[in-house]
C-alpha cells in the first residue's frame, strides 16, 4: 500500500511521520512525504528521531508536485494548511487528516523546542501505529 504524508514545509511533522511509518511498518507500506511549500528538514526533527533509533538525516524536503499523477492508497495530512491546499487525488485514495501542532512554532529555549518536537514525534507514532493496525 502506498502512503503519502503531507504538511506545509515537509520539514518536521511529515518527515518524522515518514520515518516512523517506514521504520514501524515499512514491510506493509510504501511511504513518502511532501509539502505544499517545501523548505528543509529541521535539525530538531533529525535529532529527536535519532533518539528513537530512526535516521532521517538523508531525507530532503519534497514538493507535492513531485507526486502528481501517482496513485496512493492513503494521503495523510498532518497540518491544517496542507489539508486546505492538498491537491486532488483519484477518488479511490483515502484521505486522513490529523491536526498536529507545529513544533517549530514553539517559542522558548532550545530545550523547550526539542520537548515540542519529542511530543509531536510521540503523538505521530501513536497515531501511525493505530493507523497501521487498521
Task: Please tell me what each predicted stretch does.
Residues 1-66:
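Conserved active-site segments centered on acidic
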Residues 11, 80-83:
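Short glycine-rich anion-binding loops that position phosphate/pyrophosphate groups of nucleotides
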Residues 35, 79, 99-101:
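Residues at the C-termini of beta-strands that transition into short coil/loop
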Residues 39-41, 82-85:
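Short, charged/polar "capping" segments at the starts of alpha-helices
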Residues 69-71:
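Alpha-helix C-terminal capping/helix-to-coil transition sites in glycosyltransferase folds
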Residues 83-134:
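Phosphate-binding/catalytic loops
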Amino acid at each position: 500500500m502506498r502512503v503519502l504524508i503531507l504538511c506545509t514545509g515537509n520539514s518536521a511533522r511529515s518527515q518524522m511521520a515518514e520515518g516512523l511509518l517506514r521504520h514501524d511498518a515499512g514491510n506493509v507500506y510504501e511511504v513518502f512525504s511532501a509539502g505544499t511549500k517545501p523548505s528543509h528538514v529541521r535539525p530538531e526533527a533529525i535529532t529527536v528521531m535519532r533518539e528513537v533509533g530512526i535516521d532521517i538525516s538523508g531525507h530532503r524536503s519534497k514538493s507535492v508536485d513531485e507526486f502528481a499523477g501517482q496513485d496512493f492508497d492513503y494521503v495523510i495530512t498532518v497540518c491544517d494548511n496542507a489539508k486546505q491546499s492538498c491537491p486532488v487525488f483519484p477518488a479511490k485514495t483515502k484521505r486522513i487528516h490529523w491536526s498536529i501542532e507545529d513544533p517549530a512554532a514553539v517559542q522558548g529555549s532550545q530545550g523547550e523546542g526539542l520537548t515540542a518536537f519529542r511530543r509531536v514525534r510521540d503523538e505521530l507514532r501513536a497515531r501511525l501505529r493505530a493507523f497501521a493496525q487498521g
